[in-house]
Amino acid sequence: MTVHNDTVEQAAAQPELEQPYRELGLKDDEYAHIREILGRRPTDAELTMYSVMWSEHCSYKSSKTHLRYFGETMTEEMGSKILAGIGENAGVVDIGDGNAVTFRVESHNHPSYVEPHQGAATGVGGIVRDIMAMGARPIAVMDQLRFGPADAPDTKRVLPGVVGGISHYGNCLGLPNIGGETVFDESYSGNPLVNALCVGTLKVDDLKLAFASGTGNKVMLFGSRTGLDGIGGVSVLASDTFEDGAERKLPAVQVGDPFAEKVLIECCLELYKSGIVVGIQDLGGAGLACATSELAAAGDGGMEINLDNVPLRAKDMTAAEILASESQERMCAVVTPENVEKFKEICAHWDVTCAEIGEVTTGKHLIIRHQGEVVVDAPAGTIADEAPVYDRPYARPEWQDALQEFKGVEKQDLTVALKKLVASPALCSRDFITEQYDRYVRGNTVQSHHANAGVLRIDEETGRGIAVSADASGRYTKLDPNMGTRLALAEAYRNVAVTGARPVAITNCLNYGSPENPDVMWQFRESVHGLADGAVELGIPVSGGNVSFYNQTGEEPILPTPVVGVLGVIDDVHKSIGNELGLVEEPEVLVLLGETKDEFGGSIWQQVSAREQGNESENGLNGLPPQVDLANEQRLADFFVGNEGVTAAHDLSEGGLAVTAFEMAKRSGVGLNLDLSKVHEDAFVAAFSESASRVLVATTADRVDMLLHRAEECGVPAVVIGQTTDNGELELGGESIAVSELREAWAATLPDLFGHAVGANSVVE
């Protein structure tokens, strides 16, 4: 059957044909600019390409003006180890000895609300392909998840599906899930956040970039066939113009096949090893429209594509549909003519569908044909790189001052408060979630479950490895976006440092409400400045990132949620520092590093006590978040690198010292006796304040003096606050509670809520 296409010839002959550009997310002035670029109206296929590539997701048109600050602040020394940075599929860091590590975090928020399982699964698949496109082997994934209240009916629909999608896709790929975070808050009702992180390794010489160069070189599409799934994933594709009157539902959520991706990974690695790949791009958001325009725009010529050669799995697809499809597990590569057959042989070996769909040309135009007719003829750079950049209004919200007025917190008996905290949805066990993930597949996972950071061995001979952590606090960030983002950076940095790894690079995923809201844009700008300035203070670069806007339900935006990931390198993973206390014959001494202040703004105790008092809508959020001096984080990192006097270490964050002590003891059941008077004059502050730059460490009695001396040398405040005991009790300020009692309360909450979740993973109506 011949499909009706709107051709370039028809566009010139029918200049005033009405087009559904508003339905596709384009504004009047944007559409007018497209007509100006082309000198005519766009064809349906061209309109599709511009609409998806000029979408917020692909073009960063509302955030780009602020994201430039990362480049403006990065020093030459910081950038010296970056092999690929902001603007590439993923950041790549040179870690020495000819080796490199690449990592990135990406959002898949809206699809995961519509269809939780597939939305989350394809989020994992997409970030893995970003890593593959850099020439790397993916070695691990992590996730940052945000949902509405744990007891809300919609959370019971969304959470099991999201977790199932992540676990199914990651487990089938054979990639260990080495850590993550799950947070519940009213602001995420109707708009969950699903941020997936992937890390990969490669040789420096094997780095691949997304560009098409060399006139006459061939464009190869390989992987799964192209279908109707995912159309409209990054913009709105809802016009009958593109369907020629046919009545069919075009699902905006992609459908993933992890086994196809697993084979695609191995196929890519063999292609890289063969040395025949000139440039490569994965097909994710905006599909072939993105891959072809970006490859051509980044190269030294133009490109011609024949859509008749694209392997399809649906009949009668129009050119617009083929270009906008976000069918998963696809890659696009550029190879020299003499290597086409070798390319096809390798794909055939892995049973991967492959087709030659075009070639690199002279000039700067992207020309696309379908059924013998030209349906796209446009400068590639205008599609990929020249979306309008908006300097949207931003202003400090009128309500910010009132929000920052601290109203105090109710103080209760220490053990009573501690049990409430560990049993709360905010801090209770996530085993219900994490036990669905394979954490040790491939055999290189050193730390993951309940650890400060995921630790992986990357060299079996030397024991060299990496540590990765990702953190965020929407509560802190709403109170003070700049400081809240710095706190997320500080915690991720500290989590990596306490393993004994040296932090070397940063990635991020910035999740916010509508950029058309000046309040939101102020939050976003403050966060960008906090992260960029913080990176300079720590002396490590931001290697890449992602922005997700329009996260809101109605007019109510989510908590501003900057997810910050930090990568560290450790010389010998066998010497990495764990975070759990064991049962040993001789008591271990507990030392608190860092200074404790009366800081409860945005704290978990503030949230839990507010809910207890019936202030659920407010979540008790008020005051200023803890203040962080990133120089203190650097001193802590110096303390831990190469420190063999520490037997266990755990950073202090949500819930403060008491929660950290429980987390260190819960697995073994060992008792702890803590003298809170050494921490702060107020026992409640000592137990539950969330002051930054603090770590609880354990050491043997004969190494205490050495440890304290090293702390002094590094400029880190340190004080002995207690020791382990054999009575199984956690003793705090004259009160005590059994560790086993706390563990039972901690373990019961989520299974009780989700053990029989009705309607889990059902598609939203």
UniProtKB/Swiss-Prot annotation:
The active site is at H57, H108. It comes from Corynebacterium aurimucosum (strain ATCC 700975 / DSM 44827 / CIP 107346 / CN-1). Pathway: Purine metabolism; IMP biosynthesis via de novo pathway; 5-amino-1-(5-phospho-D-ribosyl)imidazole from N(2)-formyl-N(1)-(5-phospho-D-ribosyl)glycinamide: step 1/2. Part of the phosphoribosylformylglycinamidine synthase complex involved in the purines biosynthetic pathway. Catalyzes the ATP-dependent conversion of formylglycinamide ribonucleotide (FGAR) and glutamine to yield formylglycinamidine ribonucleotide (FGAM) and glutamate. The FGAM synthase complex is composed of three subunits. PurQ produces an ammonia molecule by converting glutamine to glutamate. PurL transfers the ammonia molecule to FGAR to form FGAM in an ATP-dependent manner. Mg(2+) 1 binds at E106, N546. Signal peptide: none annotated. ATP binds at Y60, R104, N508, G545. Its EC number is 6.3.5.3. It is an enzyme of class 6 (ligase). Substrate binds at S107, H108, N109, H110, R129, Q254, E326, S327, Q328, S548. This is Phosphoribosylformylglycinamidine synthase subunit PurL. Keywords: ATP-binding, Cytoplasm, Ligase, Magnesium, Metal-binding, Nucleotide-binding, Purine biosynthesis. It catalyses: N(2)-formyl-N(1)-(5-phospho-beta-D-ribosyl)glycinamide + L-glutamine + ATP + H2O = 2-formamido-N(1)-(5-O-phospho-beta-D-ribosyl)acetamidine + L-glutamate + ADP + phosphate + H(+). It is found in: Cytoplasm. InterPro entries: PRibForGlyAmidine_synth_PurL, PurL_linker, PurM-like_C_dom, PurM-like_C_sf, PurM-like_N, PurM-like_N_sf. GO terms for biological process: 'de novo' IMP biosynthetic process. The keyword Cytoplasm applies. GO terms for molecular function: ATP binding; magnesium ion binding; phosphoribosylformylglycinamidine synthase activity. Monomer. Part of the FGAM synthase complex composed of 1 PurL, 1 PurQ and 2 PurS subunits.
